[in-house]
Each structure stands twice: as C-alpha cells, then as structure tokens.
Amino acid sequence: MFNPLAESLNGMIQSESPAAYGMLSALGKRIFFPSKGILSQSAEAKKLAGNFNATIGTALEGHAAMHLDCVMSQLPGITPNDALLYAPSSGLPQLRQAWMDKLLHDNPQMADIATSKPVVANGLSHALSIAGDLFVDAGDTVILPDMNWDNYLLNYAERTQAQLKFFPFFDGDALNVRGVDAALAEIPEGQKAFVVLNFPNNPTGYAPLEEEGAALAEVLLDHARRGARLVVLVDDAYYGLFYDDRCMRQSLFARIACRHHNLLAIKADAATKECYVWGLRVGFITFGVKDAASGGPLYRAMEAKAAGLIRATVSNCSELSQIVVARALANPDFYAERAEKARIMGGRCRKVAEVLESHPEYAQCF
C-alpha cells in the first residue's frame, strides 16, 4: 500500500506515460512530498497571515530573520531573509527558472522539447543519488564506462545495490560507441537498464566529437525502439570545459530527451564547475519524458518525488548558496566572465599537451 500522496503522484505519472511509471524503483513509487503537512501550512500562512506566522521553526525580529550581527556582517549586500531562511525543498523558484534559461541558452536543441523544470540538489553528487533512488532497485543493471568517477560505485553498487556492467570507454583514440551498443544489446526487450554517461568524462577529460555524439544518441534510441527500457543519466558535471572546436558543444541530453517513450532521460548538472563555486553545493536534476507537457502532471509529480527525497534527507538546500548562484546567473556579465575562465582553462590544457609532446612515453596518458 502506498501513502495516498504517493498514489496521487503515481497516477499523475501514469496518466501521461505508463512507460515512465514502470521505470520507477520501488522507492520511486513510494516516495512523495508531504504537501499537506507543515510545509503547506507554512506556505498558506505566508500568503494569508496578516501579522503572525508561527507555522515553521524560524524566528523573526523586526520583520526580518532573527540573526547575529557577527554572522550578517560577513554578508554585505545580502539580506537576512535571503541568507538565513529555509528554501523550498525543490529549490528557489527564481534559481530554477534561471538555470532553465541557462540550459536553453547553452543547448538550443532543447527549445524543441518539453522537459521538467530543474530541481535544486545539494551538488551534483546529490543529483546522482536522487536519480538512483528514483529509478534503481537492488539487482537492476547499471551500464557505465570503465573510465568512471568513483562516486558512481558508491551510489549504484553500494547504496542501491545494482549490478554494474562496464563497457570500454575508448575504441583506440575514439569514443567507443560500439561498446555502448554491445552492452545495450544484452538488455532483453522489456527489461530496464540504467545508463550513466558523463561528458567531458571524468577521469579522462574526453569530450565526444560532434559525429560521435550523434552516433551515441542514435544507438541509445535504437535500443529504446527495439524495446529495451532505458533510464539514461547524463552527468554534465564538466559541461562547458571544451578545448577542441570539434567537440560536441550541446549536452547529450538535448539529443535523447523526449524522443522515445522507452527512454527516460535525466540531466544532472551543477553550478559547481560551471560557475566555479565548488563549495556552495548547488546542483540540479532535470527530467525528459516523451509526450510529457512542461508544467504538466507527469513533470509536477517527478519534481515532487525528487523534492520528497530531498525533504527526507537534507530537508532543503542552502538558501544563501542558491541566492548567490541566482544573482550570478542574472548578472549581464555572467556569460562573458564564464567564457574568460574557460579560455584560461583551455590555455592550461593546451600547455599540458605541448609539454607532453616532448615526452612520448606519456602519449597514452593525454
């Protein structure tokens, strides 16, 4: 038996995509956001209470968040309410919209698809955890490259107890698209697999060429068309760190999301490295499901389930960090400043390559 709130969310997902509902894990089906508890009471009081709102565990003083001067004196230009109060579990609305706008700016192909609005996570690692909780059961197959970040092992081998299946990341000096194809070919029709792809790749730094990205997307869609049920997590932690003009500039998510009902796409990304704010811990998770409407029942339910997982673990992510990132994204100099840092990083990359040219013994390392 599910909680009535979970039942309601499950019905919203099934109404638009029975296939997407079938991909949820047992926890994914059980989880819900407690929309009728203290949080909804507080939201209602915020709108309707004329003088007093005693519904949530914060204290006010002089119509602002009660605070210590020794704290707020360190934050010039930020009000106590922006720095110290709780953010919604799904994230500040203005940040979610600002990140959505950034996704569309960076990925023009996304203009043709309808995705969820990004939900704010406590960094990219947290987004990986949310994705696993929503879609991976013990014993499920998780497909990922042999060159991978060790956090995948913690999340999917240990936390969810999935069966990890590795494909060789490289085919010579190129992305091993045939290896992905071969790994997916072992998934029988009707069976679910959770696929993790990360570009630029950690630890190799490799970013697919444009034609490799197109071929990889087609392989994923081909297997969805033949009946494999795929949840594809695109880990865009290092998005934007492209140092070769031939590299695919748009996220793989933009090529595969909303293209087939047997392929549920997830984009995990973060301000961490895109905005050079490693310790602020602001990440995002976005869903792409075929035939789901932006703002429609399915995405509202998916966002609520993600918010429920956040509520159950960290409750909500730092409002102060979210305010800082939201203001940065709203700054008219944001894209120019980001491009300048990417230029510096690109110069460092090329210098390493130049030095290694005189050391052929390291040719396989870079």
Specify the residue positions occupied by each region the protein language model found:
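Conserved core of the PLP fold type I
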Residues: D82-V232, Y239-R259
